[in-house]
Regions:
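Phosphate/NTP-binding elements of NTP-utilizing enzymes
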Residues: 1-206
Length: 206
């Protein structure tokens, strides 16, 4: 499929973000990438770039972003929308929190407070579960089927606060090297670039 004439700019990724993207691109069907993240290290920005990548490069794909609350889902939708608000490539539905692309791809932005029925990842789409450690355990019976039929990849991220729950289960499996599970731990990297407000502000402008 040919791209429209609009200029599409890529993102500048730093430190651990490059490894996260490389690891994601190497995933096979039905594999999961677990991210153990620190605060203020550009994780949301990286998720946005991955979701954009999937939507643009996998026509008619359906991806799903899930987080803790409706307000958090709306904030992430709004932040992603800022990247493309003047582009004719993307249509934003701020009522339904949906982002539709010129090539038929769509991204749904949901939370544990949302109606989580009638959607699924399709045609190469992915599921991103953010702040997983803070989601109620019973939500997994609703969201895991989103990836079952298409064997979609799932990115599971959190700043953990307890050694129990579904996030810790995923983390332990990835740490143990279980087949189909991969791990990125931001503590393994030099995060000094993100350590000051001035540097974070500079990064947000990239």
């Amino acid at each position: 499929m040919a791209y429209p004439s609009n200029k599409v700019r890529g993102a500048k990724l730093i430190s651990w973000q490059n490894d996260l993207v490389r690891e994601f691109l190497s995933l096979k069907k039905d594999e999961r990438l677990v991210i153990k993240k620190c605060r203020q290290v550009g994780c949301s920005f990286t998720f946005a770039q991955i979701l954009f990548y999937v939507a643009i490069n996998r026509p008619r794909s359906t991806s799903i972003y899930i987080t803790t609350t409706n307000s958090a889902a709306r904030k992430f939708f709004t932040d992603m929308g800022e990247f493309c608000k003047e582009s004719s490539l993307v249509s934003l539905n701020s009522s339904l929190l949906e982002m539709t692309f010129w090539n038929g791809s769509i991204i749904y932005f949901k939370s544990s407070e949302s109606q989580l029925r009638g959607i699924s990842c399709k045609r190469g789409g992915i599921m991103v579960v953010d702040e997983c450690a803070f989601l109620k355990s019973d939500i997994w019976t609703s969201i895991l089927p989103f990836t079952t039929v298409s064997k979609a990849n799932t990115l599971i991220a959190s700043t953990p606060w307890t050694k129990r729950g579904m996030y810790y289960t995923f983390y332990e499996r990835a740490l143990s090297g279980d087949p189909g599970y991969h791990l990125i731990d931001t503590r393994d990297y030099d995060l000094s670039y993100f350590s000051s407000e001035d540097q974070r502000e500079e990064y947000r402008k990239i």
